[in-house]
């Protein structure tokens, strides 16, 4: 961080199992992990007021990603294809829905839906990555607010009629 000028920086860290001399799908016995990291500028945190909140345009799509989204991996082709569809429609994010028309997540974020005095967020399962920031938001909402938080399936109709939608991501 100091070498990159300190200040408001994000750090991307990726550690893989490593490489093998000959391509194979089985895990190697004694791999040497590959470690990759870099720092990048981020905006300072907002004060949380409506005047400084960031607004984004999002589109909705049927979730076409693979069925193991709860696994953190670099296999992001499905997410990338969804984002590219959003960009083609001049949107910054895409809200994804499963075959039952229930919200899964966004292509790069977890989702919170505000309806009346309730905050809804989908329950975790194989279709959703359990985000660190999502968990922290839930803990803070429970400890420091009077908001009613419901972790449960969230329908497309509930999303489309929401008064607010929050996205959380590290």
Give the location of each predicted region.
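Helix-start/capping segments and mature chain N-termini
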Residues: 3, 21-170
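Short, glycine/charge-rich beta-strand/loop segments that flank catalytic centers
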Residues: 1, 8-23
């Amino acid at each position: 961080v100091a070498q990159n000028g300190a200040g408001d920086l994000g750090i991307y860290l990726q550690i893989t199992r490593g490489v093998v001399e000959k391509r194979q799908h089985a895990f190697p016995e004694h791999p040497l992990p590959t470690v990759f990291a870099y720092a990048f500028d981020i905006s300072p945190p907002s004060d949380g007021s409506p005047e400084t909140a960031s607004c984004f345009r999002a589109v909705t799509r049927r979730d076409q990603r693979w069925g193991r989204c709860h696994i953190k991996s670099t296999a992001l082709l499905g997410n990338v294809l969804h984002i590219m569809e959003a960009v083609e429609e001049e949107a910054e994010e895409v809200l994804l829905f499963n075959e039952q028309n229930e919200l899964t997540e966004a292509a790069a974020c977890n989702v919170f839906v505000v309806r009346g005095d309730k905050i809804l967020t989908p329950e975790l399962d194989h279709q959703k990555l359990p985000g660190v920031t999502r968990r922290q938001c839930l803990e803070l909402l429970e400890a420091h607010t009077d908001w009613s938080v419901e972790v449960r399936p969230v329908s497309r109709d509930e999303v489309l009629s929401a008064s607010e939608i929050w996205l959380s991501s590290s």
